[in-house]
Amino acid sequence: MSTENNAPVVNNFIRSIIDEDLATGRRSSVVTRFPPEPNGFAHIGHAKAICINFGLAEDYNGQCNLRMDDTNPEKESDEFVEAFKQDISWLGFKWNGEVRYASDYFDRLYDYAVELIQAGKAYVDDLSAEEMRQYRGNLTEPGKNSPYRDRTPEENLDLFTRMKNGEFPDGSKTLRLKIDMASGNINLRDPAIYRIRRVHHHRTGDKWCIYPMYDYTHCISDAIEGITHSLCSLEFEDHRPLYDWVLDNISIEHHPQQIEFSRLELLYALTSKRKLQALVNDGAVTGWDDPRMPTIAGMRRRGYSPAGIKLFAQRIGVSKSENIIDMAILEGAVRETLENDSPRVMAVVNPLKVTLTNYDAAVTASRSAPFHPHHPEFGERDVPIAREIWIERDDFAETPPPKWQRLTAGGEVRLRYSYVIKCDEVVKDAADEIVELKCSIDHDTLGKNPEGRKVKGVIHWVSAEHAIQADVRWYERLFTEQRPDAVRGEDGEYVDFRQFLNPESLKLVPAYVEASVLQAEPESRFQFERLGYFVTDRYEHRKGDKAVFNRTVGLKDSWK
């Protein structure tokens, strides 16, 4: 699949199938589709599918359709449609033509159902949902035919027409395919393809009171759109015979090939829209785009880049094997792309006051510093110094451990892009807490090493006079368990995944940051030197007024 970096394209079995199809003339082009249900926001699992479908279409100079699978109107909305469109565009992909909807094909789907009824291949059933389950059988026992299975095509057509016209109550009748109740594949045991459901649809309004089922809708929609390779996750492998049966038994010429790949399971995260919705509803997160959420909108707000997400999708590859991926792989891909693209600035998140006792405005000079050590085109910024500065409290130790190279009483350290300073005095309050360090500058060390001694430590800092205050949201992983929805209690039942929410997943940290960041636009990514990668918040950062940062990821994996 396509990525924005120079990493090699990973071979996958889908690519091999496409290569053979094109080489043999079975297909002359590649048309894929991404068909989400608009009942929530896109998450990291969708991101993988997006990269596969759109990426393969790009690589083969083909096309990828965006189609909303809107056959379940109770849970779907225009809000989720727009969210999917935004996320796909933000990732850098373009769909073919206009956004398509399964509901665009409701009339044609109905006509094909009539065709199946007339051919004696579908029937109206009066069994209740519970009765249908009892008749279906299981993996070891065949199902039983419904007592309504042998209705004539004429009777079935009359009943189906009346279903459409609203003459029967919700759930009282279904339209089922007549396949084989003894099939070893339960999906072929006369699956229902229409149900009565009086629900307002976000696009068709109240026109329909019957709605087609996913398995029926999906394959026909693919065929209508001329999809060549219908790529879906592995749980639909057992549905493929039904996909093929429907298309083989209606008067439609095009027959796409369904190909399944393993779905993504990301450790320390959830990829169930239902469970993510529960987190939103419970107030465990601030919304679908909370930076702790594994949604594309959440990852975007946290500062993940499209290139990082694409690199992640490319690295995990495409296979039929179980695809359980550690969060560190995602964070590593994001970190790698941010390292190359992020300007550097200094920020202090746990400040300790330092007074430079021999600071003299006439002789104490400031320097400029590059925004990126390897990209001179990023430019430079001024790093002003003043009599009072802030350093990280963690960069001072009154009683240092072995091999300590940062500041200590009587010790020296270099201020990044500035002078070597020496701690001459430690000031404490009545509670014996350190509140200030009094240090002296070696004025001969600006841009050069001190004479006769070696100073190894370098720390970051900001000028108390020039730095701005910023709100920093320090994010960690949302869950403490690798697989929060797969933990069983002593009774053998699954434990509520919400019990494993990380109470330390968000800390609000007041910080001091170089003044240049105040002019940054929302969604500007930075490396805070020695601290990690941060982004100005998409909504709450206000250029020239209020600086709000979200922690994206650390400089290295801290969860090993």
UniProtKB/Swiss-Prot annotation:
Residues that bind L-glutamine: D69, Y214
Residues holding ATP: E37, P38, N39, H43, I44, G45, H46, A47, K48, A49, R263, L264
Annotated localization: Cytoplasm
The EC number(s) this enzyme carries: 6.1.1.18
Catalytic reaction equation(s): tRNA(Gln) + L-glutamine + ATP = L-glutaminyl-tRNA(Gln) + AMP + diphosphate
Record carries keyword Aminoacyl-tRNA synthetase: yes
Motif 'KMSKS' region mapped to chain: 270-274
GO molecular function, a single term: ATP binding
Motif ('HIGH' region): 36-46
Transmembrane parts of this sequence: none
BP-aspect Gene Ontology terms: glutaminyl-tRNA aminoacylation; glutamyl-tRNA aminoacylation
Pfam families: tRNA-synt_1c, tRNA-synt_1c_C, tRNA-synt_1c_C2
Top EC group: ligase
Keywords in alphabetical order: Aminoacyl-tRNA synthetase, ATP-binding, Cytoplasm, Ligase, Nucleotide-binding, Protein biosynthesis
Entry-linked InterPro entries: Gln-tRNA-synth, Gln/Glu-tRNA_Ligase, Gln_tRNA_ligase_bac, Glu/Gln-tRNA-synth, Glu/Gln-tRNA-synth_Ib_cat-dom, Glu/Gln-tRNA-synth_Ib_codon-bd, Glu_tRNA_lig_a-bdl, Rbsml_bL25/Gln-tRNA_synth_N
PANTHER family in the cross-refs: GLUTAMATE--TRNA LIGASE, GLUTAMINE-TRNA LIGASE
Family classification: Belongs to the class-I aminoacyl-tRNA synthetase family.
Subunit structure: Monomer.
HAMAP family, alphabetized: Gln_tRNA_synth
Protein name: Glutamine--tRNA ligase
